[in-house]
C-alpha cells in the first residue's frame, strides 16, 4: 500500500457506499456469497470469473432495508495504508445514525464525516467507551445559524430552528416527500407523487445563499452552505497540516464529484452516472477506474494505489 515516502500524498478521503461497502445488485454480477467463513463473523464471497474466495463482513441493514458487505482484504489494506503514514478519512452522505451503527464494520480511520460534511468526528483515546470518538465542535458550530445548535438534534425536524428547517417546513407544506429521519444537518428529497426532476431543479436554483444541495442516487440532499464534502475536507486537511492537492479520493457517485475536482487523484471502483462519466472524460489523467465491480473492484484499486500515487500516472 501507500508508504510515507510518497510525501506528495498524505491524506486519503474515502466514500463508503458503493466504494468500500457494496450491495447485492452490484455484487451479484461478479460472484455470490456461498456461506459462513471459518473466520468468526465472516462470510465467503466467491468471484464468478476466477473462483477466488474473498472473506466479507455483512453490515447491519440501512434504514432503507439494504444490507451491504465489506471485504476483509479492504479493511486490511486500508490499515496498511495508515501504517504507511497516510491519514484516512471516511466521508459519506449517510445520516449520523447510519454511520454510527456501521462503525464496528468499517475501517479504523483518522476522521469520520457524515451527512455530506455536516458532522466530523475524530478518534479520542482518552474516552473509556466502546467507540472512542469525539465530535469536532468547532466545525459543528459553523452550521448553528442554518441547521440549529447541536442540542436541537433531539427536536423533531419540523420544529428545529434554522434556515435549513424552514425550507423543510416549506417543502412539507407543498407536498414533497422528504426524509429527515435521524438526520441532524441535512435532509433528503425525492421527486415522486407527481413531482418531477425539473421541480427539484427549481428548488435548487432558488435556494437561499446559506443553503447548498447535491444529488446522490437520484435524490437531492439539502444542507448548510457552510457544510458539504469539499468544505469538510478543506477543514480536515488544515487540521492535518496538509492541502487538498496532497489528498486522493476513493469514490463512486455524483455527490463525490465536487471533492474529486479539488483533490490530486481519484480512484473509482465503478462509474455510476453520466455526471461521473463526464468528469472522467474531461480529465482522464486524474481518474483511475476499475474494470471490475463490487468488492473485487475495491480490492483491485487498493492493490494498485501505491503505483498510481507514486508515479501520478494512469496504470
PLM regions and their residue ranges:
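A metal-dependent, Asp-based hydrolase signature
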Residues: 22-58, 107-121, 125-126, 159-167, ...
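Active-site phosphate-binding/coordination module
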Residues: 66-179, 271
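Mg2+-dependent phosphoryl-transfer enzymes with acidic/Ser/Thr/Gly-rich catalytic loops
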Residues: 7, 222-223, 230-315
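The start of beta-strands in P-loop NTPase/AAA+ ATPase cores
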Residues: 10-12, 110, 247
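Short, well-ordered alpha-helix to beta-strand connector turns
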Residues: 9, 85, 109, 116, ...
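Short glycine-/acidic-enriched loop or helix-start segments at secondary-structure transitions
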Residues: 23-24, 30, 99-102, 123-124, ...
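Conserved acidic, metal-coordinating active-site core of Asp-based
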Residues: 159-263
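Active-site neighborhood of HAD-like aspartate-dependent phosphohydrolases
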Residues: 2-90, 97-98
Amino acid at each position: 500500500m501507500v508508504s510515507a515516502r510518497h510525501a506528495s500524498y498524505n491524506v486519503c478521503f474515502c466514500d463508503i457506499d458503493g466504494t468500500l461497502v457494496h450491495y447485492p445488485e452490484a455484487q451479484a454480477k461478479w460472484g455470490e456469497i456461498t456461506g459462513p467463513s471459518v473466520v468468526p463473523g465472516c462470510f465467503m464471497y466467491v468471484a464468478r470469473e476466477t473462483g477466488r474466495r474473498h472473506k466479507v463482513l455483512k453490515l447491519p441493514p440501512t434504514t432503507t432495508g439494504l444490507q451491504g458487505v465489506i471485504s476483509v482484504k479492504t479493511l486490511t489494506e486500508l490499515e496498511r495504508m495508515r501504517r504507511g503514514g497516510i491519514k484516512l478519512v471516511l466521508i459519506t452522505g449517510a445520516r449520523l445514525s447510519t454511520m454510527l451503527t456501521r462503525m464496528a464494520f468499517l475501517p479504523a480511520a483518522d476522521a469520520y464525516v457524515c451527512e455530506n460534511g455536516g458532522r466530523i468526528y475524530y478518534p479520542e483515546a482518552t474516552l473509556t467507551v466502546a467507540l472512542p470518538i469525539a465530535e469536532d465542535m468547532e466545525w459543528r458550530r459553523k452550521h448553528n445559524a442554518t441547521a440549529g445548535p447541536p442540542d436541537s438534534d433531539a427536536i423533531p425536524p419540523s420544529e428545529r430552528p434554522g434556515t435549513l428547517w424552514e425550507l423543510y417546513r416549506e417543502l412539507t407544506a407543498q407536498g414533497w416527500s422528504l426524509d429527515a429521519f435521524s438526520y441532524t444537518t441535512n435532509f433528503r428529497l425525492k421527486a415522486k407523487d407527481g413531482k418531477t426532476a425539473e421541480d427539484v431543479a427549481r428548488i435548487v436554483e432558488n435556494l437561499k445563499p446559506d443553503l447548498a444541495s447535491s444529488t446522490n442516487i437520484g435524490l437531492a440532499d439539502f444542507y448548510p452552505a457552510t457544510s458539504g464534502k469539499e468544505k469538510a475536507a478543506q477543514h480536515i486537511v488544515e487540521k492535518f497540516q496538509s492541502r487538498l492537492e496532497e489528498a486522493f479520493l476513493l469514490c463512486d457517485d455524483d455527490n463525490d464529484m465536487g471533492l474529486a475536482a479539488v483533490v490530486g487523484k481519484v480512484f473509482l471502483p465503478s462509474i455510476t452516472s453520466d455526471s461521473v462519466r463526464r468528469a472522467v472524460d474531461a480529465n482522464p489523467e486524474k481518474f483511475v477506474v476499475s474494470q471490475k465491480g463490487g468488492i473485487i473492484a475495491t480490492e483491485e484499486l487498493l492493490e494498485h494505489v501505491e503505483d498510481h500515487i507514486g508515479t501520478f500516472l494512469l496504470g
